[in-house]
UniProtKB/Swiss-Prot annotation:
This is Queuine tRNA-ribosyltransferase. GO terms for biological process: queuosine biosynthetic process; tRNA wobble guanine modification; tRNA-guanine transglycosylation. It catalyses: 7-aminomethyl-7-carbaguanine + guanosine(34) in tRNA = 7-aminomethyl-7-carbaguanosine(34) in tRNA + guanine. Its cofactor is Zn(2+).
């Protein structure tokens, strides 16, 4: 993997990652395809939206369909019909959001959410699975503390994350895949600093900021990001895990972050909310019943070129799944377009103006919510 920072504006960075399945311009938003599928979208929909990289999840794919099925297809790309880069999460976040039977330095034993059977996962198994999946970017297996963990619990998770990162790198024997470390530390600046220094001492192809945007105050999210970025190398990509709202992404880009993922755009689409250049729009609301406007007049996606707000309102009113599909198409197109505008604004020196506008319309709740 190669990464080049081509231009900066303050701390915001315009860059490019060269991965096994193609180049990815940064800052970038990665649509989430947890089960080898971005909900309600085909790979062609994603290609038409301009998605350069998507995320899938090791934990879920390990359970169903299982690694052997994906091996039959010679990797995840063939399995899901996606030719561009893929990033796979290690499964750490999902494991630690489930009831655990046992956790120690060796690994984690938990019950499968599918059938209740006991499952064991550790750094070596996570690396083995991700190598078999053939993703372009793999993540180390980390210990993500629960949101209400106290200082000592977060400290223990941070120390374990370091030990597991060492084991992850040792087990990562492959040439065409990149491996990112994950910085933990909760909402404690000293632990964030310690984790960042530990991970960079090992040396990875990129670094993720984990364990944030899980319920803490927005000011803490931004503060901990600043603390973490300060100790990350300039020549490696920085990935904020789970950040997906437009205003948060702009705030994080302004603090030197390059990569983002979230189910936020697709999840709210399924509940009738569109992302627009004027903020969020609730298509279920009755005032859309007679509206002949597109979802967003600035958008050129399939949905906005062909359908009115009135029609999409009707689809949600009658419980037709097409409404969810059309809004999902739109929201992913909006996020990809937003990141293109972010990159253009860094190039042209107008990033502050773009950030100000996006933060204003989304922090105020947007229009017609």
């Amino acid at each position: 993997m190669e990464f080049e920072v081509k231009k900066t504006f303050g701390k915001a960075r315009l860059g490019v990652m060269k991965l096994h399945h193609g180049a990815v311009e940064t800052p970038v938003f990665m649509p989430v395809g947890t089960n080898a599928s971005v909900k309600l979208l085909t790979p062609r929909d994603l290609e038409e939206a301009g998605a350069e990289i998507i995320l899938s999840n090791t934990f879920h794919l390990m359970l169903k369909p299982g690694v052997e099925i994906i091996k039959l297809h010679r990797g995840l790309h063939n399995f899901m019909g996606w030719k561009r880069p893929i990033l796979t999460d290690s499964g750490g976040f999902q494991v630690f959001s489930l009831p655990k039977i046992r956790i120690d330095d060796e690994g984690v034993v938990f019950r499968s959410p599918i059938d209740g059977s006991k499952v064991f996962l550790n750094p070596e198994i996570s690396m083995e699975v991700q190598i078999a999946l053939g993703s372009d970017i793999c993540m180390v297996f980390d210990h993500c503390p629960v949101p209400d963990a106290d200082y000592e619990e977060v400290k223990e998770a941070t120390e374990r994350t370091y030990r597991w990162a060492l084991r992850s790198k040792k087990a990562f024997k492959t040439e065409n895949q990149a491996l990112f470390g994950i910085v933990q530390g909760g909402i404690y600046p000293d632990l964030r600093r310690e984790s960042a220094l530990q991970l960079t001492s090992i040396g990875f192809d990129g670094y993720a900021i984990g364990g944030l945007s899980i319920g803490e105050e927005r000011s803490l999210t931004l503060e901990m990001t600043e603390v973490t970025v300060e100790f990350l190398p300039e020549d490696k990509p920085r990935y904020f895990m789970g950040g997906g709202s437009p205003e948060l992404i702009l705030e994080l880009v302004d603090r030197g972050v390059d990569m983002f993922d979230s189910v936020f755009p697709t999840r709210i689409a399924r509940h009738g909310t569109a992302l627009t250049w004027n903020g969020k729009l609730n298509l279920k609301a009755s005032y859309n019943k007679r509206s002949l406007e597109p979802v967003d007049e600035r958008c050129g996606c399939y949905t906005c070129k062909n359908f009115t707000r009135s029609y999409i309102h009707h689809l949600f009113d009658r419980g037709e799944v097409l409404g969810q599909i059309l809004l999902t198409i739109h929201n992913i197109n909006f996020m990809i377009s937003l990141m293109k505008e972010v990159r253009r604004s860094i190039e042209s020196g107008t990033f502050k103006e773009l950030k100000s506008k996006v933060v204003e319309v989304y922090s105020s709740g947007g229009v017609n919510v």
